[in-house]
Amino acid sequence: MSFNPGNNQNSGFSFGKPAQPNSAAQGAATPAATGLFGNTNNNTSSTAPSGGLFGSNNASNTSAPSTFSFGKAATTGNSTNASTSSPFSFGSTNTNNTAGAKPLFGGLGSTGSANSTGDKSKNTASSATGAATTNPSGSTFNFGSSNNSFNFGKPASTTNTTTPAAASTGSLFGKPAATGTTSNAPPASSTSTTPATGSGGFSFGKPASLGSTNNASTSTTANSGFSFGKPATTSAPGSNTTVTPSSSITGTNDSKPAASNTGSAPTTGFSFGKPAGQAASTATDKGTTTTSSAGTGFSFGKPATTEDTNKPTAPNSAFTKPATSTGDNKPTFSFGNTSKPTENTSTTATSAPPLSNNTKPAEGANQTSSGFSFGKPATDTTTSTSKTGPLFGNKPADPSAKPGATASTTPSEPPPSSIKHKTLQEILNKWSTDLTTQTEVFNKLCDQVSDWDRTLVDNGALISKLYTETVEAEQMSNRIDDGLEYVSSSQQELFKLLDSYETQLETFDGRATSALNVERERAFGVADDILSRLDRLGEDLGTVINQMNDFSKPDDSISEIVKVLNAQLASLGWVENRIFQMEEKLDTIKKKNSDVLF
């Protein structure tokens, strides 16, 4: 699909434009129009061109530019002068340059893999004429394509390529170095110029990618950002690749490139039921042997994964932090991750030379973690790291790199999950039962707190009453204190008066007694004597009277007779009074009768 109808060679804006096969002799040049981002330059010289501003690559003699594209397919050639460029692309596949420079801001997902063979008997016509043979890959965004960056149901990719190593310079803003492949295959070996690069950003059910079985060089990279049920990727035994070391901005790297045995490295970001991907890595001072690595970001029931990666880090840029090469195996969310064996991870990271004294060097790490998992087993990690030379000048030899130098750590196994192998209904029932129990406990605690609150309120009332009584007692105590102070002041005044009287009596004692005082004293004596005598006379008179009364009481019956007669006289007087009353009543009755008759 293109928004520029007309010439097919110049597409201003394209989504998933397929590659145009180029088959031109060496020295033929085709002009290309420039676009807004990523101008394609035509160079006829044999030197390596410099990087473009926004991911532009220089083409030598033969170019098929796509100025602004999403997922332009790869163009593969056997000639060193045939190249294609994808200035600005999302998920662009391989662009093969033997001496291609890196763009300024770094291409997105592009991997160089120029193919050349050493078979003299089977490649005579191609080497004699110098023609460039291209095998374009599929579009970047496609459904069911063979080579794509975003596809559904990608078929298997079987590659057998041989690529010489190409020196490359580091980009300005942290693009990783391009990776080329070389081979030391004998002349009689089978040859193929088809690149094996499959970048799947979003894939459903991508089958396995199989490498070659011969000793030919193989470079297979399968990157899948989102996959459902992606099978394992099996690397070819005996494949041989060469990784071009990354150089700094101003310095060059004259050391020998590390020869590595590289298989496939599929990486998935989101997977359901992904099978195991096995890998093994060995870091030495001159070579690195690496097989596949697999990582998932979100998985349900992911099986075991054994990962080994060999990722050279990107060189330090001028304005950004040095690249960090990580290989993560993270089943972020997993239910029932059963029978997962121990994961062995080995990482060989090559840090770029530092740009300045305060810049942080590149870090290589391969971690296996679980964000949300039930019953994840233990994970074993093995890491080996080698470092490059300084920023400016040639890279010195690293004497510390020793084969087999690894550091392993074994974390403790997490406790088993209590809800593993349980259905959702069982979990909900358990939670409901726990909620009911906790509710009952909470209600009991609420009742207890209510009782405590009621007790506190009652005690508060008692404390208020006690405080009132205390205030009253303090007021009464203050009044008593005032009274005591008044009494003490009165007592002080009385003491003063007594002191004055005592002083006056002392003055009176000194005076002489007169004759009147003597007479008074005598009169007081006589009066006392008279009073005592009168008392004795009164006692004597009482005794005489008592004796006279005793003698004046004779024993005769006359007094008794007088008493009886007096009683009878009183009775007769009462009877007489009653007679008078009856007579008066009869008289009144008679008067009434007489009044009635007359």
From Swiss-Prot:
Pfam families: Nsp1_C. It is a peripheral membrane protein. The keyword Protein transport applies. It comes from the Eukaryota. One of its GO terms (cellular component) is nuclear pore central transport channel. GO terms for molecular function: phospholipid binding; structural constituent of nuclear pore. Residues 24-86, 123-140, 154-169, 176-197, 208-229, 279-302, 337-357, 379-388 have a biased composition (Low complexity). Disruption phenotype: Abnormal spore germination; spores fail to divide with defective septum. GO terms for biological process: mRNA transport; protein import into nucleus; ribosomal subunit export from nucleus; RNA export from nucleus. Its main location: nucleus. Signal peptide: none annotated. It is found in: Nucleus, Nuclear pore complex; Nucleus membrane. InterPro entries: NSP1/NUP62 (IPR026010), Nucleoporin_NSP1_C (IPR007758). SUPFAM superfamilies: Phase 1 flagellin. The modification Phosphoserine is found at S489, S490. Keywords: Membrane, mRNA transport, Nuclear pore complex, Nucleus, Phosphoprotein, Protein transport, Translocation, Transport. Contains X-F-X-F-G repeats. Functions as a component of the nuclear pore complex (NPC). NPC components, collectively referred to as nucleoporins (NUPs), can play the role of both NPC structural components and of docking or interaction partners for transiently associated nuclear transport factors. Active directional transport is assured by both, a Phe-Gly (FG) repeat affinity gradient for these transport factors across the NPC and a transport cofactor concentration gradient across the nuclear envelope. Component of the nuclear pore complex (NPC). NPC constitutes the exclusive means of nucleocytoplasmic transport. NPCs allow the passive diffusion of ions and small molecules and the active, nuclear transport receptor-mediated bidirectional transport of macromolecules such as proteins, RNAs, ribonucleoparticles (RNPs), and ribosomal subunits across the nuclear envelope. Due to its 8-fold rotational symmetry, all subunits are present with 8 copies or multiples thereof. PANTHER family: NUCLEAR PORE GLYCOPROTEIN P62 (PTHR12084:SF0), NUCLEAR PORE GLYCOPROTEIN P62-RELATED (PTHR12084). This is Nucleoporin nsp1.
